[in-house]
């Protein structure tokens, strides 16, 4: 392999963005900072006992990835320096880099020369290269085939630069400049404090492969280890952990939104420490990395710009504070201040972190990953994803505990102490008067005045016409909107769907229907957002983000909204808010009929740009004022297109998007709109429809109470959808794009839904426009003929003759029941034949596929392995404990027994 930084390209159903893993983690720390080889050996012993959390190939010789982070051993590297005939100076007066170079000697020499040039250009003294002693025979053939050329470098600290973070900052700049100029070299670590040894090993291979780790002179007070289990990923040398600051077990499910926001901050962020060097280190995130690597990029950026590592972790993965009545007001103000600038990186995760001085661990707010630790009387902290990784005499154990959700465990080896979570957070919460800053700058929606302005209302034919334009069906109102307004909760329905995919439907489905909600693949059962309400947050922040790298009062000048589903009164408050620091601009997403949709979207971009240049920091995208000549861009397309445009132009953290639209009325619609960039949504037509239900006597309720209950139902549904991805905050869910598109062309996805998973092609902009204008023509007949001013019953929820096709209809249900009751196989074949014929018209993707039988009959059956042999290789276990219900487990067990399997 000649490129250790190249991202794998999507191929078939594979996409590198799916790469997550479930891993084993561990650490051993001498609390007093006493360095020894025993700590190194114990850390290696921990990872060797995590074999059950480490993946390997079918031959059992190549692993998914194992690694260790240690302090730089002055004793060991002084000995190495003597062999290289160089002088390193005192401890921490030199930096050590680990490099994965291309195997090709010419490419390696070029990369080395480039790095030396960059180092000297940045004012540092390059000392020497060292080929890292390794034993290739200790690893499997697959790992050897793609093994990089592994080297270390040594760099002298300038006299004018202080030890520690100041010197590491210079090394960080050198590495970032080199990474952007080089192609194919990966740098696992470059620091004066820490070093990373890792690769594609089995857990026992790490100690054997790197001879440095066997040397008794290699001493450290810190050892952090990681074993990788690539549940749905490809192993590689580069993706093995640790990263440069963290190692990680779990998944960051909001990663798309997190990284987009972090990259957008590059346009407005400024650093009093980096100053003119800032441009050298951008972009902040390497988007070809794994979710944990991108989190590491973000933390490294904050630390190198002057933020303490524990603080950076604390605000990136905050504890659940908003609904927790047991935390102090000072801590609440602290979290509130940073929440206005940085959305949580959410998902089930256990994270260990270190900068060479402190070692810490934190769990996600739900505690969905295991982590237990011992503190011993002889001054050591031992932590791992499970107990028993190191033998400990019971009489030597001082503390035995587990890491709590949202809590931080920290060991400071410089001070020689374990820092209590409460004490640590109170320290950071007391550094600035965050409470005063919030009181003066944070604006609450409920505190804004209601302007003396009347919003347009719709009744009778005007309301009906709008409902037809935006694709409302009678059953949408009767089975969705009415129950939600009445009960304040989503109505219950049967699981599964037997109607055609949107792209195969002939009923002009809304664009929302082309997007399918994704769910966490490496997570325990979904979060119970009802019983675990304390960990959830529905608040969003509207306005420009402050400067994360510089604490100041005006950073938190944003509008806080507790429910992103807005009433028309809420929207009026925002539209006419007269608060210094806020400017609101409304941009129409309507276009003149017969104009191309692409030109209509480009016009919206121009208007958004104009508003930004005029000082706006809140944009309201509105489809009000539809008439016979004007058509609305589908709201999801408008929101996502503008959001992607702002991300590309790095304005997404400077402008907040609010949608005022008649189109959304189902929970899925709102989830998609928030997921693709809207901060808040005002579904004015859904609210007007509730008023109609009250006027018609179908809903016996006060209008405002009914609207509040409808909004509450929508919000509850969004929280439930986010919970499937292990996400607990709407702020994190916003812009996370956790959907898969089915039936949309690659051109549309790449331009307007960038980064969305889409494994089959489909409709283009012309098709989307044709669907929208067909609905518009049904309400405003261009020929001037009479139109049917009644809402259709689309037949999506219940079978209706001549409407949406259902695989389970009166005919197929009758045949299926008859076959079951009589046991008649011919009737069953009649049932399957009927379903197959219906499917050929296109219902699911599988309906479009068939077996390609060989003309000659194929391989004779007597040459094929018998079924009784094949089934012995079936696996029937669940992926994780609790992932199957009792009923599903028992049914699977019966099946296994019937197949004569153990």
Task: List PLM regions with ranges.
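Conserved short alpha-helical segments that host acidic/polar catalytic motifs at enzyme active sites
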Residues: 2-547, 552-554, 577
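Flexible, glycine-rich loop/tail regions that form catalytic "lids" or insertion modules at the edges
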Residues: 63, 76, 285, 302-349, ...
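Short beta-alpha connecting loops at secondary-structure transitions
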Residues: 276-285, 390-396, 654-659, 688-708, ...
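Conserved, mostly hydrophobic/aromatic
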Residues: 409, 623, 673, 729, ...
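Alpha-helix-loop-beta-strand connector modules within alpha/beta enzyme cores
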Residues: 633-659, 710-714
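Catalytic cores of alpha/beta
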Residues: 659, 663-677
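Glycine-rich phosphate-binding active-site loops on the catalytic face of alpha/beta enzymes
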Residues: 674-695, 752-753
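Positively charged, low-complexity/disordered segments
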Residues: 890-902
């Amino acid at each position: 392999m000649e490129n250790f930084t190249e991202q794998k390209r999507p191929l078939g159903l594979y996409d590198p963005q799916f790469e997550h893993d479930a891993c084993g983690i561990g650490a051993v720390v001498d609390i007093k900072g006493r360095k020894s080889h025993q700590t190194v050996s114990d850390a290696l012993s921990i990872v060797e006992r995590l074999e059950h959390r480490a993946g390997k190939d079918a031959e059992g010789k190549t692993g998914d990835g194992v690694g260790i982070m240690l302090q730089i051993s002055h004793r060991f590297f002084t000995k190495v320096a003597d062999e290289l005939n160089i002088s390193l100076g005192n401890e921490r007066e030199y930096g050590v880099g680990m490099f994965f170079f291309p195997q090709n000697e010419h490419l390696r020499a070029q990369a080395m020369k480039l790095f030396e040039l960059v180092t000297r250009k940045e004012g540092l003294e390059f000392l020497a290269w060292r080929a890292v002693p390794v034993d290739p025979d200790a690893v499997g053939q697959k790992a050897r085939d793609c093994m990089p050329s592994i080297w270390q470098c040594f760099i002298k600290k300038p006299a004018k630069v202080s030890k520690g973070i100041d010197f590491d900052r210079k090394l960080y700049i050198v590495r970032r400049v080199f990474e952007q100029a080089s192609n194919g070299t990966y740098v696992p670590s470059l620091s004066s404090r820490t070093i990373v040894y890792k690769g594609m090993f089995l857990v026992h291979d790490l100690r054997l492969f790197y001879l440095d780790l066997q040397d008794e002179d290699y001493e450290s007070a810190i050892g952090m280890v990681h074993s990788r289990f690539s549940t749905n990923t490809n192993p590689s040398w580069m993706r093995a952990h640790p990263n440069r600051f963290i190692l990680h077990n779990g998944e960051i499910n909001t990663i798309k939104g997190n990284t987009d926001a972090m990259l957008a901050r590059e346009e407005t962020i400024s650093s009093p420490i980096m100053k003119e060097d800032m441009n050298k280190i951008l972009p902040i995130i390497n988007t070809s990395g794994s979710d944990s690597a991108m989190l590491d990029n973000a933390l490294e950026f904050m630390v190198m710009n002057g933020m303490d590592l524990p603080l950076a972790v604390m605000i990136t993965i905050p504890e659940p504070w908003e609904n927790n009545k047991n935390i102090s007001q000072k801590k609440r103000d602290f979290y509130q201040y940073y929440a206005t600038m940085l959305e949580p990186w959410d998902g089930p995760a256990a994270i260990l972190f270190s900068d060479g001085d402190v070692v810490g661990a934190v769990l996600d707010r739900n505690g969905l990953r295991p982590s237990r630790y011992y503190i011993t009387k002889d001054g050591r902290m031992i932590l791992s994803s499970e107990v028993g990784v190191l033998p400990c005499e019971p009489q030597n154990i001082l503390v035995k505990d587990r890491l709590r959700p949202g809590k931080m465990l920290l060991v400071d080896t410089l001070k020689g102490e374990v820092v209590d979570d409460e004490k640590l957070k109170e320290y950071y919460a007391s550094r600035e008067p965050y409470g005063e800053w919030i009181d003066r700058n944070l604006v609450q929606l409920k505190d804004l005045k209601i302007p003396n302005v009347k919003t347009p209302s719709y009744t009778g034919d005007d309301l009906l016409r709008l409902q037809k334009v935006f694709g409302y069906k009678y059953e949408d109102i009767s089975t969705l909107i009415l129950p939600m307004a009445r009960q304040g909760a989503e109505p219950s329905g049967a699981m599964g769907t037997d109607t055609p995919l949107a792209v195969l439907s002939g009923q002009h489905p809304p664009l929302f229907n082309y997007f399918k909600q994704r769910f966490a693949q490496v997570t325990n059962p979904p979060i119970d957002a009802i019983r675990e309400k304390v960990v959830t947050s529905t608040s969003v922040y509207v306005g420009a983000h402050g400067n994360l790298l510089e604490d100041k009062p005006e950073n938190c000048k944003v509008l806080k909204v507790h429910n992103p589903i807005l009433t028309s009164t809420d929207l009026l408050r925002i539209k006419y808010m007269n608060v210094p620091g806020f400017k609101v601009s409304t941009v129409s997403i309507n276009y003149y009929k017969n104009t191309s949709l692409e030109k209509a979207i480009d016009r919206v971009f121009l208007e958004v740009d104009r508003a930004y240049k005029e000082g706006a920091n809140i944009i309201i995208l509105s489809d009000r004022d539809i008439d016979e000549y004007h058509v609305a861009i589908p709201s999801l397309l408008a929101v996502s297109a503008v959001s992607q445009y702002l991300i590309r132009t790095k304005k997404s953290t400077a402008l907040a998007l609010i949608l005022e639209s008649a189109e959304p009325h189902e929970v899925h619609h709102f989830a998609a709109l928030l997921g693709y960039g809207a901060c808040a949504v005002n579904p004015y037509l859904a609210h007007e429809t509730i008023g109609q239900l009250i006027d018609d006597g179908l809903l016996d309720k006060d209008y405002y109470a009914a609207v509040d209950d409808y909004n509450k139902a929508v919000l509850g549904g969004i929280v439930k959808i986010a919970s499937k991805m292990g996400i607990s905050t709407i702020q994190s869910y916003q812009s996370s794009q956790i959907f898969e598109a089915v039936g949309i062309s690659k051109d549309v996805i790449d331009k307007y839904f960038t980064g969305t998973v889409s494994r089959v092609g489909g409709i283009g902009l012309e098709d989307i426009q044709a669907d929208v204008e067909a609905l518009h023509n049904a309400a405003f007949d261009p020929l001037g003929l009479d139109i049917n001013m009644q809402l259709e019953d689309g037949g999506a929820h219940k079978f209706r003759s001549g409407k949406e096709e259902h695989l389970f209809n009166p005919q197929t249900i009758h045949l299926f029941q008859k076959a079951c009751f009589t046991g008649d196989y011919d009737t069953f074949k009649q049932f399957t034949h009927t379903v197959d014929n219906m499917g050929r018209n296109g219902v699911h993707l599988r309906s479009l596929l068939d077996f390609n039988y060989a003309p000659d009959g194929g391989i004779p059956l007597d040459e094929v392995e018998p079924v009784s042999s094949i089934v012995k290789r079936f696996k029937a276990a669940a992926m994780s404990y609790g992932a199957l219900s009792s009923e599903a487990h028992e049914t699977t067990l019966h099946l296994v027994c019937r197949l004569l399997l153990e």
